[in-house]
Amino acid sequence: MDKAALLLSVLLAQTPQASLDCKASGEDFVYECTVMLMRGGQPLEGAEVTIGADMPSMPMAHSVKPAKARPGTRPGEYKARLELEMLGEWAIRLRLAGPVRDQLILHYEFDGKGATPRKP
């Protein structure tokens, strides 16, 4: 493996990875979300996580006020209440601070039950 490929693999291993699980709360367009953060194959603990959302199909028309996530019960788990403006595809923006500073964008389709991952 050459030096550039090795450096790239090290950087990618240290880049935070996130998964999102959102369930409808029973209120219109309100979801209870669980974010799982990993870094280098290990749970990312001690992060300050802010979750926001933008609707890609309507730039600057629908933007959700960011909410601060709270630590969950498992390592790398964070929970937040996400209040959207309508159903459809949303770009979920995770801002991370603390042991790592980064921003992750996840694309999800929200319906009346919850959220499903989408490709950007």
Please identify what each model-predicted range represents:
Residues 4-12:
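Sec-dependent N-terminal signal peptides
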